[in-house]
A protein has these predicted regions:
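Flexible, Gly/Pro-enriched loop and linker segments at secondary-structure and domain junctions
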Residues: 77-82, 87-119
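A common structural junction motif
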Residues: 143-151
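Hydrophobic "lid/gating" helix adjacent to the active-site nucleophile
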Residues: 1-28
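Mixed-charge, glycine-accented linear interaction segment located at domain edges/termini
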Residues: 125-138
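Non-catalytic regulatory/linker segments of enzymes
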Residues: 37-38, 131, 144
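Structural preference for long, well-ordered alpha-helical segments in enzyme cores
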Residues: 1-5, 138-143
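Helical lid/core segments from catalytic subdomains that handle acyl or acyl-like groups
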Residues: 32-88
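Core RNA-modification/binding signature centered on pseudouridine synthases
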Residues: 118, 122-123, 153
Length: 155
């Protein structure tokens, strides 16, 4: 998702000190469930290397991080909050009343099979000043292209 969203300029705009800023590259911040406490950590990981390298780094960082929150999120991240326990048709998050919060939030739920196809609920929440439906459509196309090329049997 990060790779595809980074290819679409509108997903990289943010408000910073009252001004509009376009970041060259956006990294990731995701929730990670600490199974022992059933509390979530917010983990920040630079999006670098291959997908396999990124996943290995992200898993290691999530497991090693002791703090649940390491401070306010920076502007140069995409937020991810997966919910693999439920299949949903709609999800909505509060925005804490911050009108200048332009950090996109991506969610996905529990995948399921229907008509011999694997389906995954996926939600995108964005700031409408920068991202419109056409941009979300471009993201969906890029994600689908990437998924169509992915060899699941090698993983």
């Amino acid at each position: 998702v990060t790779e595809c969203a980074n290819q679409i300029e509108e997903f990289r705009y943010r408000f910073l000190d009252g001004k509009i800023v376009l970041f060259d590259k956006i990294d990731t911040a995701f929730t990670y469930l600490d199974k022992a406490t059933e509390l979530f950590k917010v983990v920040n990981v630079p999006f670098e290397g291959s997908m396999q390298e990124y996943c290995k780094t992200a898993k290691h960082k999530a497991e090693m991080q002791k703090d649940y929150f390491t401070g306010p999120l920076s502007n140069d991240v995409f937020q991810f909050s997966p919910m693999p326990w439920v299949t949903y048709r709609h999800i909505s998050h509060t925005n804490s009343g911050k009108k200048d919060n332009a950090t996109p939030l991506f969610d996905w739920g529990k995948f399921y099979e229907k008509d011999e196809r694997l389906l995954l609920p996926f939600s995108v929440q964005v700031h409408h000043s920068f991202v419109d439906g056409v941009h979300i459509g471009k993201l969906a196309e890029k994600l689908q292209e990437k998924l169509n090329c992915y060899n699941y049997e090698d993983k």
